[in-house]
């Protein structure tokens, strides 16, 4: 079902956050099933494919045999149950009626029914979700009318919500975002068929904060938007806060990235500086920091804010991230780039010196973040011995750090924001939306906290960093780096617990890894706080949801 459609629609699945290989991965996890005699099946026995004739006793007729197949009778039953969308209280009644009749005419067909049917039901629910998305997208025909887009988006949203857990989706995009994705996909298909970009589509309104560039004028912007919707799935990267689509333009030498904010999982921790402003300052400075260039910023046909950046991955391949830690040469490159950031003139950026210094501001910000967490997350934190915002503020207030000259910071140097062997060669830093002005020590310590780093590598990086940066940027670092490590351990305990409680962004790789290591994170945080960790009773295996 998917293979014939994947070239045309695979990118749309990726934009929606739907993995394309979920059916295959699910099938690989299914244990060996009981043997049952194969027979003729109707794999699409749904309401639209059956006609009930009235008479002395009801009889079905007019069956649609176009989906006929041959195989395990449980497969046919599962397909019928899923496609009929019976209320949950009727499912068992239907299954028992089927089993009763099968025991009468073909007893071996019910062998292993209770054990094997749930696997077939889940498989069919995944299958139906893919099928429903394809059907809804195809139902548009050549239309880009808003009512048609919203209707298709509603159908897709319903299908994805019904199977989100089975698809491995931690959240489903809201219908407005789905409709926008459908518009881009549909309009891009129409443009490709017409072999030109009509004036009525992909109109562009420039954001004055990033004036039109001579090396990337508005006609290139429109062409980038016109091919975004039909980009293949392996060129679409959906992160915790942004959707990035890599496109190649005709007669333009390098790929570019169309970058949009996602609405599904709003980031609780917001950056202080606009990403475009940070990238502009870095580009103007001319320092040796490998970072994207901002090519355009503005609004598309649907009044959605869009940025276009240079693509910093290796040519023709997906970006590679140092998820298992930096190599020695890469560690040196990162330190050198942090030293170069210290040379950037950030006076044009909107930032004020925080009262009480950077660390006090950071601690206050974390305490405010904790106080604003949802009630469910706060209850979960209390159960695990984590303090509320007021007590956390008092605990963090005990620490002091030396004053160091403020510099431009990336703010979130996790491995997925670093690209190996990028366009400019060497290690490239991407995703600058958490940029800020502050203590240069913080960027390095946060990176070491978020990235697997051996002790000898940490010593190497600190030694190089302390020698590369100006003296006013490194004073007192030997005593202070642990304070920043404490605050990052504590932050992770709250951030990861919130994701576990709310389910936000759990499908992204960096979040999955953080959540999987939560027991270690919690132990480190309670140790940093000097508090006793409470024992949270574990749910018995018999009560866990499979």
Give names to the regions the model predicted.
Residues 1, 12, 19-33, 280-289, ...:
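Conserved kinase catalytic-core helix
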């Amino acid at each position: 079902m998917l293979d014939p459609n994947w070239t045309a629609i695979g990118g749309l699945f990726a934009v929606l956050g739907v993995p394309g290989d979920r059916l295959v991965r699910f099938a690989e996890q299914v244990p060996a099933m009981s043997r049952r005699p194969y027979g003729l099946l109707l794999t699409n026995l749904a309401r639209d494919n059956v006609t009930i004739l009235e008479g002395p006793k009801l009889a079905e007729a007019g069956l649609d045999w176009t989906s006929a197949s041959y195989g395990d009778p449980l497969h046919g039953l599962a397909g019928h149950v899923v496609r009929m969308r019976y209320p949950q209280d009727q499912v068992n009644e239907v299954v028992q009626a089927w089993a009763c009749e099968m025991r009468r005419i073909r007893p071996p067909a019910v062998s292993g029914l209770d054990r094997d049917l749930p696997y077939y039901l889940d498989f069919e629910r995944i299958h139906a979700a893919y099928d429903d998305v394809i059907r809804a997208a195809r139902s548009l025909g050549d239309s880009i009318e808003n009512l048609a887009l919203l209707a298709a988006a509603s159908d897709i949203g319903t299908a994805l919500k019904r199977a989100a857990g089975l698809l491995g989706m931690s959240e489903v995009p809201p219908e407005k975002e789905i409709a926008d994705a459908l518009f881009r996909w549909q309009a891009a298909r129409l443009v490709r068929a017409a072999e030109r970009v009509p004036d009525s589509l992909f109109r562009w309104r420039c954001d004055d904060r990033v004036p039109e560039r001579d090396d990337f004028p508005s006609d290139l912007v429109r062409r980038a938007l016109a091919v975004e919707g039909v980009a293949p799935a392996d060129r679409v990267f959906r992160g915790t806060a942004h959707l990035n689509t890599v496109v190649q333009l005709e007669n333009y030498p390098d790929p570019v990235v169309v970058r949009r904010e996602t609405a599904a999982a709003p980031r609780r921790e917001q950056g202080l500086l606009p990403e475009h402003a940070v990238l502009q300052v870095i580009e103007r400075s001319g320092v040796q920091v490998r970072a994207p260039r901002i090519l355009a910023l503005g609004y598309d046909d649907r009044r959605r804010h869009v940025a276009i950046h240079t693509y910093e991955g290796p040519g023709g391949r997906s970006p590679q991230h140092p998820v298992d830690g930096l190599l020695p040469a890469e560690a040196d490159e990162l330190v050198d780039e942090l030293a170069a950031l210290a040379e950037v003139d950030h006076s044009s950026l909107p930032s004020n010196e925080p009262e009480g210094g950077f660390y006090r501001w950071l601690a206050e910000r974390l305490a405010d973040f904790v106080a604003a967490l949802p009630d469910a997350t706060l209850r979960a934190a209390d159960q695990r011995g984590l303090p509320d915002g007021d007590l956390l503020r008092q605990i963090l207030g005990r620490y002091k750090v030396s004053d160091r000259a403020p510099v431009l910071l990336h703010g979130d140097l996790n491995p997925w924001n670093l690209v190996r062997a990028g366009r400019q060669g060497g290690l490239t830093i991407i995703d600058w939306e958490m940029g800020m002005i502050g203590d240069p020590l913080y960027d390095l310590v946060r990176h070491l906290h978020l990235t697997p780093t051996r002790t000898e590598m940490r010593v190497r990086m600190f030694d190089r960093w302390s020698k590369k940066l100006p003296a006013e940027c490194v004073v007192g670092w030997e005593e202070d780096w642990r304070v920043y490590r404490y605050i990052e351990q504590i932050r992770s305990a709250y951030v990861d617990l919130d994701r576990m409680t709310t389910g936000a962004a759990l499908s992204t790789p960096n979040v999955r890894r953080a959540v999987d290591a939560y027991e270690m994170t919690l132990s480190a945080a309670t140790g940093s706080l000097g508090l006793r960790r409470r024992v949270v009773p574990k749910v018995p295996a018999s009560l866990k949801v499979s």
